[in-house]
From Swiss-Prot:
Mg(2+) binds at residues 25, 198, 212. One of its GO terms (molecular function) is magnesium ion binding. This is Ditrans,polycis-undecaprenyl-diphosphate synthase ((2E,6E)-farnesyl-diphosphate specific). It comes from the Bacteria. Its EC number is 2.5.1.31. Substrate binds at residues 26-30, 38, 42, 70-72, 74, 76, 193, 199-201. Its cofactor is Mg(2+). The active site is at residues 25, 73. Binds 2 magnesium ions per subunit. It is an enzyme of class 2 (transferase). GO terms for cellular component: cytosol. Belongs to the UPP synthase family.
Length: 253
C-alpha cells in the first residue's frame, strides 16, 4: 500500500479530480496472454490496486472507488468466483493494517449480504478499524451494481412514504441522493476504465452523471503510476460545463 518513503505531495494537476473511480478490467486477458489461469490475473491485479491506492494517497485525492466485483460477476464459473472470494479475504487480511497506518478509511459498498459470513466479518472488521481515519477514503465496490444502488435507495424512500414520514410529491433528487452509496463524499469527477472497453458496466450510474470518462487499453495488472498520471493530465485538459455553456471550475463549486 502507500510507501513510507513517499510524501503526500498534493501535486494533482491544476483543477485535478477529488474523487476518482476505476473500472478494473483486463485481469483475465492479461493472464490468458501469459498462458495462465484467470485467477493468476486477479492476483496480479491486487498489485495494481496497491499501486493505485499509493498514488491516490501521495497525490492528495479525497476518494478512490474501485469496482472489484459486480453483481453480474456471479455468472462467472463457480471456481473463479470462489477463488475471487478467497482472494478478497486474503487481501483484506494482508492490507488493512497498512491502510490504517497511512490514514486510509476503507469502505465496502454493495450488497455484501450474499458473501460468506467469514468475508462479511473481515469487511466489518476492516471498516471499523479504519472508520476514524481522515486521509483517503478507499471504497471497494463488491457485489455492487448501479441499478441495485438506485433501487435500494428508492425502497428506503418508499418505506418512508408508507410510514407517513414522507409525502410522494416532496421527493426530489436530494431525497434519493441521501440513500445512494457514497452520498457523503465529493461527487465522482473522473471514471477510468482499463482493458480497452468503452462502457460503464452498471457502475455508479447515479454518481457519475457529470464525471469525465477516460478509457485506456492498458490491462488492469499493468496499470501503474504513469498511466494514472496520464488520466489525471487528460482530466485537467477537459472543460467541465455540468450542462451549461461555460466551463466551471470544480474547485469553486
Amino acid at each position: 500500500m502507500p510507501s513510507d518513503n513517499q510524501k503526500n505531495t498534493n501535486d494533482l494537476p491544476l483543477a485535478g479530480p477529488r474523487h476518482v473511480a476505476i473500472i478494473m478490467d483486463g485481469n483475465g486477458r492479461w493472464a490468458k496472454s501469459r498462458g495462465k489461469m484467470r485467477i493468476f490475473g486477479h492476483q496480479a491485479g491486487v498489485k495494481a490496486v496497491r499501486r493505485s491506492v499509493s498514488f491516490a494517497v501521495n497525490h492528495g485525492l479525497d476518494a478512490l472507488t474501485l469496482y472489484a466485483f459486480s453483481s453480474e460477476n456471479w455468472n462467472r464459473p463457480a471456481q473463479e468466483v470462489s477463488a475471487l472470494m478467497e482472494l478478497f479475504v486474503r487481501a483484506l487480511d494482508s492490507e488493512v493494517k497498512s491502510l490504517h497506518k497511512h490514514n486510509v478509511r476503507l469502505r465496502v459498498i454493495g450488497d455484501i449480504g450474499r458473501f460468506s459470513p467469514r468475508l462479511q466479518e473481515r469487511i466489518r472488521r476492516s471498516e471499523v478499524l479504519t472508520e476514524k481515519n481522515q486521509g483517503l477514503t478507499l471504497n471497494i465496490a463488491a457485489n455492487y451494481g448501479g441499478r441495485w444502488d438506485i433501487i435500494q435507495g428508492v425502497r428506503q424512500l418508499a418505506e418512508q412514504v408508507q410510514e407517513g414520514i414522507l409525502r410522494p410529491d416532496s421527493i426530489n433528487e436530494a431525497s434519493l441522493c441521501q440513500y445512494i452509496c457514497l452520498n457523503d463524499l465529493a461527487p465522482v469527477d473522473l471514471v477510468i476504465r482499463t482493458g480497452g472497453e468503452h462502457r460503464i458496466s452498471n457502475f455508479l450510474l447515479w454518481q457519475i452523471a457529470y464525471a469525465e470518462l477516460y478509457f485506456t487499453d492498458v490491462l488492469w495488472p499493468d496499470f501503474d503510476e504513469q498511466v494514472f498520471e496520464g488520466a489525471l493530465n487528460a482530466f485537467a485538459q477537459r472543460e467541465r460545463r455540468f450542462g451549461g455553456t461555460t466551463p466551471i471550475d470544480a474547485d469553486a463549486s
